[in-house]
Amino acid sequence: MVKESQENEIKSICNNTIIDPSLGEGRGGYLIGAATSNSGKTTFTMGLLRALRDRGLKVQPYKCGPDYIDTMFHEIASGRESVNLDTYMASDEHVKGVFKRYGEDADVRIVEGVMGLFDGYDKSKGSSAEIAMLLNIPVILVVNAKSVAYSVAPLIYGFKHFNPKLKIAGVVFNMVASENHFSFLKQACEDAGVPCLGYMLRNHDLIIPGRHLGLTIEAREETEELIGLAAKEVEEHVGWPLPPPSPVEREPIREREQIKEDKVSIGLSPSGSLPTEGSPMLITSEYVKSGGRGHLIAIAKDSAFNFTYRANIDALRELGEVIFFSPQSDERMPDCDLLYLPGGYPELFASDLANNASMRDSIKAFAERGGRIFAECGGFMYLCNDIDGIPMCGVFPFSATMMDAKLHLGYRQLAKDNCQLSIINSQLPKGHEFHYSSVIEPDTLPEGIRKEQFQLSAKGQAVDTALYHYKNVLAGYTHWYWAETGFAELLDLFKCKDTEA
């Protein structure tokens, strides 16, 4: 009776909600797409997430592609950690499994797309449209209506008919000037044969002012205000209810093949003690299967370092206990077997990081005595001598700089021919690069530092993105996705030819 009462309550809520009332285990969701970037899909997504949350629904957010910032917005709006879905960095089966796994207890899933709906790394490969079709969920298309009226009709018609396998649930217009303006847009939608779901008025307070929102308490308050305004727009101007989402078929989630018969190098001693430099650092597959109890994995997490994938962190939990710490405010790094320094914006908080000398010294000492460190992008910058003259950890004798900033952007994969594939049939890990900074190396690298350049772009072209080794420290600009391939396997594959393990 209690369960029936709860279901009736949900159905009552949904009678006036954007989501179909027939909720329950295994529900599907919607993908929020757009004709182009900067159409307002993030603003609409935040408003939709908050509006649904305010109605008492459990909403699981997702983000297409490798983006870290939008997932932070999602978490603030929904109260649930957002999950990335990327068909370049992971297989279709893995993406479907992640979509189902993290939304098991949700009433509805909302996926925010990336760029234009059909934009991918190779035509539409890896695009939002590809993910929507893979997951069998309909698309809510956000169209920027600034400076346009009835001319949106052929655009909408084209998106509806370009790929018949893609379901367009309807259109939401953004940057609408007035109700009269909306009347022209609504007529265009009807003539294009696509439902018009509503609109969001042109409001400069709804424009996201920068990509750094959500990183500080002050910025989070600003984000909360923006989300509240967006939710109000959704409540007032988006039609209720929307077409029902597609159900997710209940098929077993394929477990990733992280357990191998061979031993895999992870840089942790089976006893859980800190390995000394030069000692064998192997962990057996049986130990991984047992959960790696006794191993501590410390992850930097604060305003300066927060670019992580939820599925990656859960994969690390398979290897041991995960603990978080703040390089900005904690006195020193925690005792651990593996230190993970993810990306973020250390350049924005360089003074705070520099002022915490005890933390920097503890990380440098950990590296010097053979501690295992894995650092990506902003974490790599933190390990350099300095960021534009502001002192950092000094593990690598490099200077990180934002001077002459140039965007380095793109997917990355390992060059198979250059890597020692000690794990037979293992899927090569992939990742992405996104940064404006650069590192200035000395003319000659000091003894003990190795520089490896064995990464390719999504189209298989060699790139100069490097990976640096010092003792048991592995660092570089690429953000890697190991939730499918496994973190132990990732480190094992970084053993390259002509280098020592």
Task: Identify the residue ranges that each predicted region occupies.
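Intrinsic disorder/low-complexity segments
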Residues: 1-28, 246-293, 416-428, 496-501
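ATP-dependent carboxylate-amine ligase catalytic core
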Residues: 26-135, 143-169, 179-183
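Structural motif
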Residues: 31, 110-112, 140, 172, ...
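A short helix->loop->beta-strand "cap" motif at the edges of active sites that frequently abuts
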Residues: 137, 194, 368-372
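Internal gly/pro-rich beta-alpha loop/helix module
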Residues: 150-247
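Amide-donor transfer/coupling interface in amidating biosynthetic enzymes
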Residues: 206-249, 253, 283, 287, ...
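Phosphate-binding active sites in nucleotide-utilizing proteins
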Residues: 295-355, 361-366
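Cysteine-nucleophile active-site neighborhood
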Residues: 346-419
